[in-house]
Amino acid sequence: MNIKDIKKINFFISEKKNKNIHLIGIGGAGMMGIALILLKLGYKVSGSDLLESLMIKKLINLGATIYLQHSEKNIKNVDFIIKSSAISSNNKEILAAKKRNIPILLRAEMIEILMSFKKGIAVSGTHGKTTTTSMIADIFIDSGLDPTVINGGLIKSINSYAKLGSSSYFITEADESDASFLYLNPNIIIVTNIESDHIDHYDNSFKKLKQTFLTFLKKITLYGTAIVCIDNNAICDILTNLKCKIITYGFNKNADVRIFLYKQNNFIGHFYIILKNNKKLNIILNIPGKHNALNAAAAIALAIHEGINNDLMITSLKNFQGTCRRFEFLGFLSIDQGFDKRANCMLIDDYGHHPTELSETIKTIRISWPNKNLIMIFQPHRYTRTYNLYHDFVQTLSQVDVLLILHVYSANEKFIVGADSLSLFNDIKKLGKNYVTLISNHNMILDTLIQTLQGNDIILIQGAGNIDTIAHKILIKKTKKVIK
């Protein structure tokens, strides 16, 4: 889409009462935020998806018309369409829209239109985008700056994926999975890290992935700012090519915003931030893990850059409630083991689906609860990711005490030989790990769990597919209510 197209679209969507915007894949994490903002702005919003969810019900209550199927009938009175990156070009609604010459926008193109004439802040990176965006949103809201926010996960403090604000600030998560973040033109870009993921979209070239991040960063004008994690080698490789202002953060002693003396106690992270002027900030973070300290450091670097009061920022981080499905403590699950015995297990839900994310979650649990029996229920996400990172998955998954592995959530990808859960199961067993079970039927989960409980257990629900829905249905509904 070129500048003329954007001007044209901006022109006709300004007539809010007469135009209908249709979102295909409206239930996706990246799409719900856009739908919420459009509804708040007064547009007519419709959408389609295959599964109902609490967020879809919320959108309906706000006035959206949502169809739980894909059909060309859904776009009968539509003026233009926004499509999720997960939607195929062969989708019935996409094909019908092309026949009728209805404009079709990608998610990122719509965000760019919404962000026009605002001070755009984009949070990008392989890991940590959603949590970092949530922290930034909380800091700006608590500081009275009233930003507009679009996030890829539910921000607990506002119980939403998005918020329409009255100020000039527009904060958004920027998706690198299909390089669509290149449509954005923010004033400030945060890059949390660059690792091999979604590599099939980059011709299986990590070099091309890094180059795409560099292209994104080069979109910052001389008056803009890049805030980047100096601990990440791939980021350091591309920094010399930037001409804008650069602020670095990390554990590295050369960071502009440096993390120092990190400690962890249960769900609390404690560390100091050392600034270039040697000023020291005492940070207490309401979520554990060094990776979350890095996420907080990115938010701190931005807050300082924007002149936010340090005390307000520190208080906001201390009160940070977290993000849905990001190391989310659900409570204690009481499971009947028979013979009047019950096991009370800590239940943690986590969206991580990349070996690095899994490894960080495991490390975090081992630091705070070293003697707990760690049981992971894992659902691999995408055959391409499993194939490209197969060895890393085998090594990382072998680090837990008990592993229940579900079949791969394909996300509409075709099966790849050797990148399935049975292959993972067999190769983990070859390492001499006898605690791994392949879950071929979801009804096996509870019985398998009962056999592995030791009385000091942590159950970790891990993955990005529909594992949270499965686990909640199988575990929570068939056991005693979770007690926090």
UniProtKB/Swiss-Prot annotation:
UniProt-recorded Gene Ontology molecular function terms: ATP binding; UDP-N-acetylmuramate-L-alanine ligase activity
The enzyme's E.C. designation: 6.3.2.8
Catalysed reactions, as listed in the record: UDP-N-acetyl-alpha-D-muramate + L-alanine + ATP = UDP-N-acetyl-alpha-D-muramoyl-L-alanine + ADP + phosphate + H(+)
Positions of transmembrane segments: none
Keyword terms of this UniProt record: ATP-binding, Cell cycle, Cell division, Cell shape, Cell wall biogenesis/degradation, Cytoplasm, Ligase, Nucleotide-binding, Peptidoglycan synthesis
Domain of life: Bacteria
GO BP annotations listed: cell division; cell wall organization; peptidoglycan biosynthetic process; regulation of cell shape
UniProt key word Cytoplasm: yes
Signal peptide coordinates: none
Pfam family, one: Mur_ligase
Enzyme class: ligase
Binding site for ATP: 125-131
Subcellular location: Cytoplasm
GO CC list: cytoplasm
Pathway: Cell wall biogenesis; peptidoglycan biosynthesis
S-adenosyl-L-methionine listed as a keyword: no
Main location: cytoplasm
Family under the similarity heading: Belongs to the MurCDEF family.
HAMAP family per record: MurC
NCBIfam families membership: murC
Protein name: UDP-N-acetylmuramate--L-alanine ligase
